[in-house]
């Protein structure tokens, strides 16, 4: 029974059309008829969102064409038609890119190869270590934790102590009880991870490790299973995390992300705090706490 449930949520090539169908249905159900400028007759709609024929009308295509697309049929919209459908559904930039990925995987375009292993070049390791007072880490494909500096490991978790296959941010967030305790707003952080992972999965639909990761999380976490089924996609490039650290107490850290040249699937995360705040004091305390260990390793 468990394997059957996991298969329902695993991102396989055979399920690409279903992924497209589910995404379009969800986007249509969230549409706002008034925002779309559709006339209303004063009657309450039986179901929320837009009707198929309304999306087709707004996009300038036939109802039959849009219906076949929403059913996941293997048809290839032109860029103009795809843009019209995205506008009709009022998709944001990330959702548009996700739709493009899903449409692309249903066509006969050459498949994109996914390297089996991502590596961080030595200069980036040096950069991480140079950021002594700021936590920093590099995430790769499917949110794998490729590298982190000592302060990031002290703030979040000692990722280097995990087996290589377990060094994954989403996996840690959902399956490690300490992560649930660390994030004051765990639900928001976990939802964001699901949305980022779904966007990444659409970009590499044939990646075996991504498929295995999604399957494992779907079988192990009811929260992941529920949020994955919502088909929401987003990539947060900055924000704030509120933490309840077991050593230094509560603090808030802001983060910014940078996509690294040479590998668009590698992202540098740098965490900062406002100066002269209790959060900065907490981070400074953590720096002093790990300093002896860092010094001894250097010697």
Predicted ranges, named:
Residues 41-46, 52-53, 59-76, 84-86:
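Recognition helix of helix-turn-helix/homeodomain-like DNA-binding domains
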Residues 18, 22-58:
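Short basic helix-loop element that most often maps to the first helix and adjoining turn
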Residues 122-299:
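Hydrophobic protein-protein interaction segments
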Residues 25, 29, 57, 87, ...:
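Short polybasic/polar patches that bind polyanions
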Residues 25-32, 100, 104, 129, ...:
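Amphipathic, well-packed alpha-helical segments that form the structural scaffold of globular domains
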Residues 3-10, 14-25, 77-83, 87-119:
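Short amphipathic recognition helices of helix-turn-helix/homeodomain-type DNA-binding modules
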Residues 35-49, 109-123, 129-130:
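An N-terminal domain-cap segment
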């Amino acid at each position: 029974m468990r394997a059957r449930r996991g298969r329902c949520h695993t991102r396989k090539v055979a399920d690409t059309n279903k992924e497209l169908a589910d995404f379009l249905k969800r986007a249509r159900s969230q549409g706002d008829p008034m925002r779309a400028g559709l006339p209303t007759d004063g009657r309450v709609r039986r179901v929320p969102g837009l009707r198929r024929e309304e999306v087709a009308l707004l996009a300038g295509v036939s109802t039959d064409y849009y219906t076949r697309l929403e059913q996941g049929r293997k048809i290839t919209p032109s860029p103009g038609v795809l843009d019209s459908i995205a506008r009709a559904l009022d998709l944001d930039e990330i959702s548009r890119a996700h739709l493009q990925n899903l449409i692309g995987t249903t066509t006969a375009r050459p498949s994109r190869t996914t390297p089996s292993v991502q590596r961080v070049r030595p200069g980036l390791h040096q950069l991480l270590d140079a950021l002594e007072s700021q936590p920093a880490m590099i995430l790769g494909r499917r949110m794998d934790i490729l590298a982190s500096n000592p302060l990031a490991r002290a703030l979040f978790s000692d990722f280097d102590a995990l087996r290589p296959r377990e060094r994954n941010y989403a996996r840690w967030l959902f399956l490690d009880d300490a992560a649930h305790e660390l994030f004051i707003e765990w639900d928001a952080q976990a939802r964001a991870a699901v949305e980022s992972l779904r966007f990444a999965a659409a970009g590499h639909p044939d990646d075996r490790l991504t498929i295995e990761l999604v399957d494992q999380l779907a079988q192990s976490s009811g929260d992941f299973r529920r949020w994955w089924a919502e088909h929401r996609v987003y990539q947060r490039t900055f924000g704030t995390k509120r933490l309840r650290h077991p050593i230094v107490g509560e603090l808030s850290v802001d983060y910014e992300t940078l996509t690294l040249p040479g590998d668009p699937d590698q992202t540098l995360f740098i965490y900062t705090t406002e100066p002269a705040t209790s959060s900065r004091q907490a981070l400074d305390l953590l720096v002093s706490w790990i300093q002896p260990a860092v010094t001894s390793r250097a010697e």
